[in-house]
Regions:
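Cytochrome P450 proximal C-terminal region
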Residues: 103-111, 207, 212-260
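Cytochrome P450 catalytic core segment centered on helix I
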Residues: 1-55, 59
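Cytochrome P450 catalytic-core helices
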Residues: 76-101, 211-229
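Conserved cytochrome P450 K-helix/beta-meander segment immediately N-terminal to the heme-binding cysteine loop
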Residues: 43, 162-190
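Conserved cytochrome P450 K-helix E-x-x-R motif and the immediately C-terminal K′/meander segment
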Residues: 23, 27, 109-150
Length: 260
């Protein structure tokens, strides 16, 4: 790929698109400051204060946060749905159990926000998909103080990188590490497992801000579509991946829809 600083036609179009998007977001931020706060995410970000300094975010910081929410939310949502339907097509027994839950709770109607907590197996299906195909393949953290991990001394400022693929498929933590087995996330199994064995959205105060929104959005989409259609692979696919910011299929996953 040509570096972004080389003024090719493609790079110029990308630069223009980024500038247009930046102007769009900054206009929203300026209007909100002049019109007053509302009951939404942007207003929450505007009123948030740094725990150490007590300062609120600058317009530049608000722009960056909004950009992350827009694009990270889109990628995470599409990635989770793609891999979930791929896995369901490979594991029909799981799909049958999911359909039974959807039928029992929704009875053919469109799901609403109040229905999401009443679909525990759907959440297990999503969690198991995220275990096998975590949207973000690695997590990185800078140490703010000296530490020791498993006998290794790590000085302040070290960069610690967690390989989620390895952690999420480690046989010490998962009964069937290479299988699509939503029962990994039933109450008993989850309680017996170290909390840090499953980190698809990160952990701690810097956990993904869009986690709950993404899961809710995907639950509404899955609840609507899975009641009406069965999805099957249109051509063989072995689940090979490539990492381009998020975990994506190496080649498109093409599926056929048939009415239920």
């Amino acid at each position: 790929d040509v570096p972004l600083f080389v003024p090719t036609a493609r790079n110029r179009r990308m630069k223009e698109a980024r500038q247009e998007l930046r102007g769009f977001l900054m206009d929203i931020i300026r209007r909100r400051r002049s019109e007053g706060l509302q009951n939404d995410l942007l207003s929450m970000l505007m009123t948030a204060r740094d725990a150490d300094t007590g300062e609120t975010m600058t317009d530049e910081q608000l722009h960056d946060e909004a950009l992350i929410i827009f694009f990270a939310g889109h990628d995470t949502t599409s990635s989770l749905l793609t891999w979930t339907w791929y896995l369901l097509s490979k594991w029909p027994a799981v799909e049958e159990k999911l359909h039974a839950e959807l039928a029992g709770v929704l009875g053919g109607r469109a799901p609403g926000l109040d229905d999401v907590p009443r679909l525990p197996y759907l959440r297990q299906v999503f969690d198991e998909t995220l275990r096998l195909y975590s949207p973000i393949p690695i997590l990185a953290r800078d140490l703010t103080e000296d530490d020791q991990i498993d006998g290794f001394s790590l000085p302040k400022g070290s960069l610690v990188v967690l390989a989620l693929y390895n952690t999420h498929r480690h046989p010490d933590f998962w009964e069937r590490p290479e299988a699509f087995y939503p029962e990994h996330f039933d109450e008993a199994a989850a309680a017996a497992r170290p909390r840090s064995a499953y980190l698809p959205f990160g952990a701690g105060p810097r956990i993904c801000i869009g986690m709950h929104f993404a899961l809710m959005e995907d639950a509404l989409v899955m609840g609507e579509v899975a009641q009406r259609f069965t999805l099957r692979l249109a051509q063989p696919h072995d689940g090979e991946v490539r990492y381009v910011g998020v975990t994506r299929p190496e080649r498109p996953i093409l599926m056929k829809l048939s009415a239920r």
